[in-house]
Structures are given as structure tokens and as C-alpha cells.
Amino acid sequence: MRIAIVGGQNHNQETYGKLLGKTGRVEIHFYDGIPKKHNKRNLEKLIKDVDLVIVILGACSHASMWDTKKAAKKCHKEVLFSRGIGISSIVKQIAGKPAYTA
């Protein structure tokens, strides 16, 4: 399974990758959630090649969150939203347990 995580600090990316990638079944791709010049295009490029998108709400700009939602809709990908920024919240999202309920 290939997962895109949008939002979060760069130093967490290595930790997420190590813990989630241990099984060999999960490939993690990151986007820090900071709006950039070609934000929409970069997100579309990332999202088209993954199976699932997780947005870390507390570590992502509003602009990137909306751009992510639009790109995921265009690419027909599922988006999950996590209020927690820790690895346990991300693992729960992947396992299908509600880390965030609207």
C-alpha cells in the first residue's frame, strides 16, 4: 500500500517511515503541507501514485488541505483526516480505526 501523508514536520518523516514501513507492505510519501508556488500541481503528482491520503490537520495549512482534497477528488483517491500529529494517530488511520470523527 502506498500512502501520502500531507502535513507534519520534516523530523517526523523519518520516524513515520521507519515505523510504518517495517512491514514492507507500506510505502510512505510525504508533503509538508506548506503552500508552495506550484502546490496544486505538486499535490496532484503525489496523490495520483498513492492508494490513500492522510492529512494531518494540525500540521497543514488550510490552502494545502483544500488543494489536497481537490487533487484527491480529481484522482479518485480516499482522504482521511487526522487531528493527531503522532505516529499512533497515523497508524490508527491506516488500520481503519477512527483517529478523527467529524
UniProtKB/Swiss-Prot annotation:
Highest taxon listed in the record's lineage: Bacteria
Sequence similarity: Belongs to the UPF0751 family.
Protein name: UPF0751 protein Dhaf_1351
Organism, as annotated: Desulfitobacterium hafniense (strain DSM 10664 / DCB-2)
